[in-house]
Amino acid sequence: MGCCGCSGGCGSGCGGCGSGCGGCGSGCGGCGSGCGGCGSGCGGCGSSCCVPICCCKPVCCCVPACSCSSCGSCGGSKGGYGSCGGSKGGCVSCGGSKGGCGSCGGSKGGCGSCGGSKGGCGSCGGSKGGCVSCGGSKGGCGSCGGSKGGCVSCGGSKGGCGSCGGSKGGCGSCGGSKGGCGSCGGSKGGCGSCGCSQCSCCKPCCCSSGCGSSCCQSSCCKPCCSSSGCGSSCCQSSCCKPYCCQSSCCKPCCSSSGCGSSCCQSSCCNPCCSQSSCCVPVCCQCKI
């Protein structure tokens, strides 16, 4: 498969680049709107039958359900193909619904790289099977989605986008059923430096509007403190221990209810006074 912006290829698909296809910018560095290196028709396909997708992963081809008779890198619904399979055709690297192939299976068999219309596979799924790299008409997958399935990197049967998105399903990396995306972006909207859904080419960040409960979108992003102070919802429970919201290395807070036995949450915190009137809950120090 082609790889935008990487001379040596990307990840396991074309080694030398990192999982994000290192060296690519948020806009798939070095790739033009036509998916750099691929023609407007997506490498051998006519512009009327293939939808180019461009991202910094080992993907530079057409949406797997294009209707042309043959494609350079991706398959049509009934024709042969170089790397991706169609619903009824044979293949070189991927399987069709009824035909065997070099690396993948047919309609009912598993496969190494791409799947048929009904068969699951190691890397790509069919219409009902999960997949990792390419999707079928109805199956979710790890990297490419089907018409109703979520995805991480590529698009499904109806919704194209910069990096991902199925026709009805959300995705892990980029836009949804109606919206394309650049680096981030939800189902309809793009994003700047943060917010929206998370892209593989855009590390999650805090929202410019502040650090509320939805500020950090995944465990990959260090939790932010609430700008209003150190309330109970300041740090997110899934990725933050009950620290004060004053700094990233803040010691545990005392219970706001007083200074009982549960006031200080670890031995790292100075003990509070036994009476609630002489305890400062935020920093676990005594009022003396």
From Swiss-Prot:
What tissue specificity is annotated for this entry? Restricted to hair root, not detected in any other tissues.
Q: Which UniProt keywords apply?
A: Keratin, Repeat
The UniProt entry's GO CC annotations, sorted and at most eight, read: cytosol; intermediate filament
Repeat (sequence) residue spans along the chain: 49-52, 55-58, 61-64, 201-204, 220-223, 239-242, 249-252, 268-271, 278-281
Superkingdom, natural source: Eukaryota
Metal-binding recorded as keyword: no
Region entry 9 X 4 AA repeats of C-C-X-P, spans: 49-281
Question: Whom does it interact with, and what assembly results?
Answer: Interacts with hair keratins.
Q: What does this protein do?
A: In the hair cortex, hair keratin intermediate filaments are embedded in an interfilamentous matrix, consisting of hair keratin-associated protein (KRTAP), which are essential for the formation of a rigid and resistant hair shaft through their extensive disulfide bond cross-linking with abundant cysteine residues of hair keratins. The matrix proteins include the high-sulfur and high-glycine-tyrosine keratins.
Q: Which family does it belong to?
A: Belongs to the KRTAP type 5 family.
This protein's name: Keratin-associated protein 5-4
Query: Whose protein is this, by species?
Result: Homo sapiens
Name the gene: KRTAP5-4
